[in-house]
Amino acid sequence: MSGDYANYTVLMPPTPDNQPSGGAPPAAPSAGGARPGDLPLPPYGSSSSSRLVNRRGGGDDGAKMDRRLSTARVPAPSSNKSLLVRSQTGDFDHNRWLFETKGTYGIGNAYWPQDNVYGDDGGGGAVKMEDLVEKPWKPLSRKVPIPPGILSPYRLLVLVRFVALFLFLVWRVTNPNMDALWLWGISIVCEFWFAFSWLLDQMPKLNPINRAADLAALKEKFESPSPTNPTGRSDLPGLDVFISTADPYKEPTLVTANTLLSILATEYPVEKLFVYISDDGGALLTFESMAEACAFAKVWVPFCRKHSIEPRNPDSYFTQKGDPTKGKKRPDFVKDRRWIKREYDEFKIRVNSLPDLIRRRANALNARERKLARDKQAAGDADALASVKAATWMADGTHWPGTWLDPSPDHAKGDHASIVQVMIKNPHHDVVYGEAGDHPYLDMTDVDMRIPMFAYLSREKRAGYDHNKKAGAMNAMVRASAILSNGPFMLNFDCDHYIYNCQAIREAMCYMLDRGGDRICYIQFPQRFEGIDPSDRYANHNTVFFDGNMRALDGLQGPMYVGTGCLFRRYAIYGFNPPRAIEYRGTYGQTKVPIDPRQGSEAMPGAGGGRSGGGSVGGDHELQALSTAHPDHEAPQKFGKSKMFIESIAVAEYQGRPLQDHPSVLNGRPPGALLMPRPPLDAATVAESVSVISCWYEDNTEWGQRVGWIYGSVTEDVVTGYRMHNRGWRSVYCITRRDAFRGTAPINLTDRLHQVLRWATGSVEIFFSKNNAVLASRRLKFLQRMAYLNVGIYPFTSLFLIMYCLLPALSLFSGQFIVATLDPTFLSYLLLITITLMLLCLLEVKWSGIGLEEWWRNEQFWVIGGTSAHLAAVLQGLLKVVAGIEISFTLTAKAAAEDDDDPFAELYLIKWTSLFIPPLAVIGINIIALVVGVSRTVYAEIPQYSKLLGGGFFSFWVLAHYYPFAKGLMGRRGRTPTIVYVWAGLISITVSLLWITISPPDDSVAQGGIDV
């Protein structure tokens, strides 16, 4: 208390809720005022908390009177704030007293805490008083609009360019080139298509937004002491993390192990995090590599927590440049890092030696079995030796139930049993701190030593069943995880993508658990890549899409699902509609319109409960109400015949709701509902998880049709996201300040083209299927519909693109151009269209943050991919639709991190593919056409330089787009394969002969001919 005041009197006003407990009239205050020691003990405090007034006020028998202040001034230094001029109204200055003293004042009580704690009677467990006071409600996230100074000119330029394109096309149609109608007709058709495709691509970009998450508010709301959570235990929902892999030789197990380690060490409540790996190949190599990773995680995860390591992928951490001690405060960091680095090197040696170890073990044990069989055969058993198979053996001396090194019936890649192995059990619900002496080399005192649960899964595969590639594996993981952990949210990763920002998951939860988050089906993170060449020759970073298109879609109904780094709401994956108290309508999907509650009742259940969730939820009557509102919850024809799985659906829906801590939260759960510990796994639960990943489980169900990942397309990710948007769900694009996740991308030209081919083929499949956006429901917003329509249409642009790339060559060969003359009107329109395009590019760079070089690389690879992979995708898609020929793709090989002298060796490796032929043809034809055009103009008596200028500039512009392709074919130091020269020569000879045949030379130099 300030030294300015010698004494004071606290008197309470006679409010209706502050009346004397007896019938006695209010007593006057004593002359000396109310002292803290004179007040009675609080009715709910301990003996040491005697500094709190009685339940309804201070004074004798709770007398209530006007609050007054009696003070005596004491001289004080002029710098003391308490000497400020007092209010002349005579009212009590509440703020002043709250500032000057440590007392807490209110109607009916005053509190002097000791050391800012309450309830500490010497036995510990003290709780701060402010923790027991209800905190003001805070949003967990907010939208950050693009500044109008950027967005308004951007939209205006889109309108200007649209008008310019319209006028240009009108002029082109009304001014044909009568000397070359065929050339004019081809160009007109191409230009109309380009204008249409530009409109489809540009319109969804009109409303880009940014978002920001408040991690401090998330911690305060879910992990801080409160009246409903006095101990501050985490109230966050559970999260199931999926890792997908299929071939340990194309996807190195060391890469997968590093991904697993980064997930196990992420910053999320350990008891709420559950990690699964789906090994679709059923390989023992993957199984034993994950076992090695789990053993190393026992020291790696506590090390990351102790020293706040970033990133938590050990390979990326130890290979990153810079000072590793920067920002580290603990004196033992250098010693710990040196020891853990040595342990990681030994871990890598063990993992890399596993293939040889497994094979040597198999050879030794198979030799033993054959010896025993020969002994039995010698004893009279004639069939003993014939029954011995070349098995693959586990470390405990038993047969591996998955795929063997030498495939045999029931042990082949497409024919093996289900495997579920919980390698790390559920951690203890309470924090388990390390102690001095727990580890011989690391001091883990006061470090949480727990590790999240981890399970290895390999679904059953049998001949005669369609396994539906990655989508089938994801659905198997969804069902198994629902039985084992049933986290209401799921995060999926490819095996080569790892967590680069350990706070990224928390940022995603800010959106899912915020007000209105129950209508969000998934949070998509941008894909970031490492190991890309500095010039990004083949646009691997794809920043134009991830930072431009996807950010713009976030302002509509949400970004598309792009395969990895996506956090899902489990309930949305199950095919249910979102809770719909309002409908979003309008061009941008921002207009809120209330709807009939009966229309949205099917997706707004009351509550749920059950064993699988492990949380405190509603009773049996709530489950019965939920089942009544959701007849599909118990429909085996939709979800299968697992009763345990069906019961888990209501629990997952309930636990995924936001907190009911604000009147505007219409579909929430009470705070503190997820504080109870989870029951341990038992044998029956694990057996049920094995059952739901059997190959027959999906028979006569809607898995892959309306439930889970959707089957029937090689781009199952886009289709799955489209289905959820089509039901009215929204999605969010989460761009974190530090990259959330990182992965690898193919830097080899052939691998990159095959990757683009797979994506484009999936888009063609979407276009010819019922997932075409033209057939979408009215819940899909207009501009979002245009974006999905563009996904299905963009490969067809290749048909027009390759014709347009050949137009300059045809112009130079024929001596004509797409217009009769280079009319000023034509040049003006062309200039206006080009200028508006460049201005749009500059503004897009401004609001998206991409660089001009990245934009130009994207344009170049759009032409390269459009005339190769996209063209092949259209042909393959048409063959599938017309002839029913199925399309299969090989798994893209992931490069393991190695200490190589040249990290970009793959960039210079040339692997011939038929996809090279169309771009080679375009390049060769344009070069020959340039030579022909220049020769004709030079040797003509009346040179027509305008036609040469138009065709020549056009041809140079085409060749500029193919520069990365040509550079890639050169290899390194002239190591171009012979087949490239062969094809280039064949194309040149063919084009030359074709031109001579179509336009034979004559003696008329005046007509532009060349004397021969």
Swiss-Prot record:
Record protein name field: Putative cellulose synthase-like protein D5
Pfam family, one: Cellulose_synt
Species per Swiss-Prot/TrEMBL record: Oryza sativa subsp. indica (Rice)
Keyword annotations: Cell wall biogenesis/degradation, Glycosyltransferase, Golgi apparatus, Membrane, Transferase, Transmembrane, Transmembrane helix
InterPro entries per record: Cellulose_synth, Nucleotide-diphossugar_trans
Keyword Glycosyltransferase: yes
Compartments (UniProt record): Golgi apparatus membrane
Gene designation: CSLD5
One function term, GO molecular function aspect: cellulose synthase (UDP-forming) activity
Enzyme class of the recorded protein, top EC level: transferase
Disulfides per UniProt: none
EC number: 2.4.1.-
Biased composition regions of type Low complexity, renumbered to the chain: 20-37
Region (Disordered) residue spans: 1-85, 597-620
Domain of life: Eukaryota
Family indicated by similarity: Belongs to the glycosyltransferase 2 family. Plant cellulose synthase-like D subfamily.
TM spans (from-to): 150-170, 180-200, 799-819, 825-845, 871-891, 914-934, 948-968, 978-998
Biased composition (Basic and acidic residues): 57-69
